[in-house]
A protein has these predicted regions:
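Two-component system phosphorelay core
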Residues: 1-122
């Protein structure tokens, strides 16, 4: 399971939970479930021009991405949160597009990590 990349650092993810593969598996499940809902919340808030809601959802994506060491998603969510906090609607739209792209890039390594953790839960 040793894999380090700019997209997903599986070594850091495992170290972040003290080597507890079961807990990491739970965190990965939470991240997968929450991220699609949060991206939908961001999309809806952008349509309404509700930057505080965009910022709140981006913050939650950032925190969950940090918990699983999804580095590029974390960076994209951080940028989106900053744009929303600064009242930059157009910048938030652009940052949201980047976040969606990064989530798409994350899917293969995230699936691989979920499978690796699931195979070696002891």
């Amino acid at each position: 399971m040793e894999q380090t990349s700019e997209i997903l650092d599986s070594t850091a993810a495992l170290a972040g939970v003290g080597g507890d593969r079961i807990f990491l598996s739970e965190l990965l499940g939470i991240f997968r479930a929450a991220s699609s809902t949060l991206l939908d919340d961001i999309r809806k808030a952008l349509v309404k021009g509700d930057l505080p809601a965009v910022g709140n959802a981006a913050h939650l994506v950032k925190v969950t991405a940090q918990n699983v060491a999804a580095r590029r998603v974390y960076a994209a969510a951080t940028l989106l949160e900053e744009m929303a906090t600064c009242g930059e609607l157009e910048g938030a739209r652009e940052a949201s597009s980047r976040l969606v792209e990064e989530m798409d890039y994350l899917k293969p390594p995230l699936t691989a990590l979920v499978n690796a953790v699931g195979r070696s839960r002891c």
